[in-house]
Amino acid sequence: MRTSRSPVRSRLAPLFTGVAALAALLVAAPAAHAADPPLRDLAAAKGKAIGTAVTGSKLTGTYGEIAGREFNWLTPGNAMKWGSVEPTRGAFDWTEADRIVDFAEAHDQDVRGHTLVWHSQNPSWLDNGTWTPAQLSQLMNDHIALEVGRYKGRLAAWDVVNEPFNEDGTYRQTLWYNGLGTDYIAQALTAARAADPAAKLYINDYNVEGVNAKSTALYNLVRDLKARGVPIDGVGLQAHLILGQVPSTLQQNIQRFADLGVDVAITELDIRMQLPATEAKLAQQRTEYDAVVKACVAVTRCTAVTVWGFTDSDSWIPDTFPGQGAATPYDENYAPKPAYHGIVTALGGTVTEPPVPAGCSAAYSVANQWNTGFTGNVTIRCAAGSSLSSWRVTWTFGAGQQIGQAWNASCTQTGATVSCANASWNGGVSSGGSVSFGFNGTWSGSNPVPTVTLG
């Protein structure tokens, strides 16, 4: 889990360059609109949920309208963490958490409680105290009983234990692990089940989206907990991802957890990029949001995808990774970005693309071919009287071809479908002009020329 960010006007000045560039891109492009039907209806038709992390104090105006319309799950970004609800021992503040739960109930939404046992954002009195194992166990169990019990019957799921592992798959050295050993996890799950038998109980972590040492440690933990009869209903894959680094084993990993007999949720999805954003980066981000959501849709026991804040104005990324951002489906002015439309298409919806000017077209050719490799070229041309300020082309290979390195364009391939968008320097195609890009690829058996769509 990651914290929600501070208001946008408090951000460091250098980041405004990237924000302004992104705004210019979105203003210059034809107007984009939210889906009709909204995301929550598209997800429901697939038997899934689509959620967002929210800040309770912002659930008014446009922010509240989008949160209520588009999503059927809400996760409190910070409001239910121990440091928020009990900053002083024995003194509780449920204002923000209650506001989110009340909003969700008014908008027919489920709530994912986040989070009960974590190494971060604990109250200082807890972190700085000296506790015996018995005292620490009692504190943890009492906290879980109090918070889960307060919302009994009102929350659908809880992230009971958050981020228990290091990157190499060893247990993170935390207050809980150091005081109670690995058994703190089973204790926490058991206490949560006792406090609300109907709520689904999850272990949640980051960098566990693909098959790796950390996700395998989580897999082994869940397998062992189930073998011991400890209540565990699901795993949360946070999915704080970097543009161009979506794990190729994401769907395989989701499936292996599902095969253990637990649900899987993508709980904190965002895909960050180096600022400034460009049309090419936004197009690639759209493809990657589409791929992540499709991986969940493909696995029956993957129940939900939650984005970690739906708007760039409420994202934790810029304050944590200076110079990076544009990670969410909506821009800072609440306009849906290409990433939003990637979610739409992954959920089976349709997107009305801006019309390509008459007289502009794209042509594919094979410039060179050898053994199992080839070089492909694509040329975008506009006849006299037509022009483009940016472009994106797609095609579907018919014989298993794969693209490799590309130049003068940003290209991604998902299955047989390839999407390429202009680089920062060649988006404009003037009246009567053309631009070209190329790539190396592989083939086997045959290498037919696909039909290219410009749009």
Give the label of every model feature segment.
Residues 72-78, 162, 195-205, 218-247, ...:
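Aromatic- and acid-rich polysaccharide-binding/catalytic face
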Residues 39-40, 69-88, 95-210, 272:
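Substrate-binding cleft and catalytic face of glycoside hydrolase catalytic domains
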Residues 55-70, 137-147, 213-225, 250, ...:
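Short, acidic/polar
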Residues 1-34:
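Secretory targeting and sorting signals
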Residues 115, 200-208, 239-240, 257-289, ...:
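Active-site clefts of carbohydrate-active enzymes
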